[in-house]
Amino acid sequence: MTRKLVLLRHGQSQWNLDNRFTGWVDVDLTEQGRQEAAAAGKLMKDEGLQFDVAYTSVLKRAIHTLQGALKELDQDWLPVHKSWRLNERHYGGLQGLDKAETAAKHGEEQVKIWRRSYDIPPPAMDVTDPGHPGHDRRYATLDRNALPGTESLATTLVRVLPYWHDAIAPQLKAGQTVLVTAHGNSLRALYKYLNDISNAQILELNIPTGIPLLFELDDNLQVQSYRYLGDPEAAKRAAEAVANQGKAK
């Protein structure tokens, strides 16, 4: 039996538009982002996808993308589970900074390493910083010492995988069709795990906003196939635009 899993990165956020490092900062969608969410829902509807359960982060840009997509799908009733483990990678001291200005200051190669390497985190945010998640009530039930002040993709994967194994994978194994709406790096982490790609290969992977990525999995959740829904050239162009965000102007 083929299991179906869709990974969907949130639509354009205000800080995507502003070309700023976002991480765990809770910024909302732009009007374009809301349109991308609806368009993603239409692509999934045209594909004939009938979901059984959905998962998202505790950040509004992902939550609102999921809501917009489900509305277009006419599946608003779907059970939705939110977890901090699906949050974007924490960008530490880079959060809020302009990507192009940071590239001009530190060099494009350094910014590419911070953005896309596997195991090198950006400079950490101090725990006393008001923006540290330890000061955010949505994480009040978690051990403050376990909350990140920065993350690499490797540590993001360590954060995401327990939720995959404990919550998402059992639903897929039970034959459920699953939608995960999250963020560029939490989805890159899942992509790396599912496709078992190397640390070097993940450096070149960019996930575009608002375009559903459909995986077909076997009974053991091994990948049989995967593809972006809609126009593959449009997905390619959108991924290239993500890659270019870290370049100096």
From Swiss-Prot:
Fetch the InterPro entries from UniProt.
His_Pase_superF_clade-1 (IPR013078), His_PPase_superfam (IPR029033), PG/BPGM_mutase_AS (IPR001345), Phosphogly_mut1 (IPR005952)
So what EC number does this one have?
5.4.2.11
Active site, renumbered:
10, 88
Specify which residues bind substrate according to the UniProt entry for this protein: 9-16, 22-23, 61, 88-91, 99, 115-116, 184-185
Biological process (GO) annotations held by this record are: gluconeogenesis; glycolytic process
Keywords of the record, alphabetical order, are: Gluconeogenesis, Glycolysis, Isomerase
Domain of life (superkingdom):
Bacteria
Q: Which Pfam families does this one have?
A: His_Phos_1
- PROSITE patterns recorded: PG_MUTASE (PS00175)
Quote the catalytic activity from the record: (2R)-2-phosphoglycerate = (2R)-3-phosphoglycerate
Question: What is its pathway?
Answer: Carbohydrate degradation; glycolysis; pyruvate from D-glyceraldehyde 3-phosphate: step 3/5
> Quick check: keyword Isomerase in the entry?
yes
Q: What Gene Ontology molecular function terms does this protein carry?
A: phosphoglycerate mutase activity
What is the top EC class of this enzyme, as a single word? isomerase
| Tagged with keyword Phosphoprotein | no
| Site feature Transition state stabilizer, where | 183
HAMAP family (UniProt xref): PGAM_GpmA
Instruction: Report the sequence similarity comment from the record.
Output: Belongs to the phosphoglycerate mutase family. BPG-dependent PGAM subfamily.
Q: Which NCBIfam families match?
A: pgm_1, PRK14115.1
- Role this protein plays: Catalyzes the interconversion of 2-phosphoglycerate and 3-phosphoglycerate.
How does it associate, per the subunit comment?
A: Homodimer.
Q: What name goes with this protein? A: 2,3-bisphosphoglycerate-dependent phosphoglycerate mutase
Record lineage = Bacteria, Pseudomonadati, Pseudomonadota, Gammaproteobacteria, Lysobacterales
